[in-house]
Amino acid sequence: MAATMQALLVIALLHLATATPVVTKHKVSTFSTGFLGHPVGGLGYGGLGYGGLGYGGLGVAGLGYGGLGYPGAALGGAYTHHAALGGLGYPLGIGAGVVAPHVVNSKIAAPLAPVVAAI
């Protein structure tokens, strides 16, 4: 768990170091309302949003709401998603009939249910 958190923090720092501020009404790549959004498919509301990328069947996207959002991935019919509300977010996984929401409200969340999809 500690190694996972450390890896996520490194990813967040790399994103902060490389993200490009985008403030535009262009909705194809970035939806912007007074925030910093990654120029590739980023969303954010008062926070930092990670970009959406596609890799041959693997789709990733991210959301940030006043915190750091980590990517969600669609893998073989299973869907996982990460959201952050004032903190670091863990996966919101939907797959094989199992819903596992992991949401943060100004703190770090622990898993609420098993996540089916591999991350």
UniProtKB/Swiss-Prot annotation:
Q: Reply yes or no: does the keyword Ribonucleoprotein apply.
A: no
Region 7 X 5 AA approximate repeats, as annotated, extends over 41-90
Q: Where in the cell is it found?
A: Secreted, Extracellular space, Extracellular matrix
What are the recorded GO MF terms, alphabetically? structural molecule activity
- The signal sequence is 1-19
Q: Name one GO cellular component term.
A: extracellular matrix
Matching InterPro entries: Lamprin
> What does the subunit comment say?
The polymeric lamprin chains self-aggregate to form fibers and have secondary structures particularly rich in beta-sheets and in beta-turns.
Q: Kindly provide the name given to this protein in its UniProt entry.
A: Lamprin 1.8-10
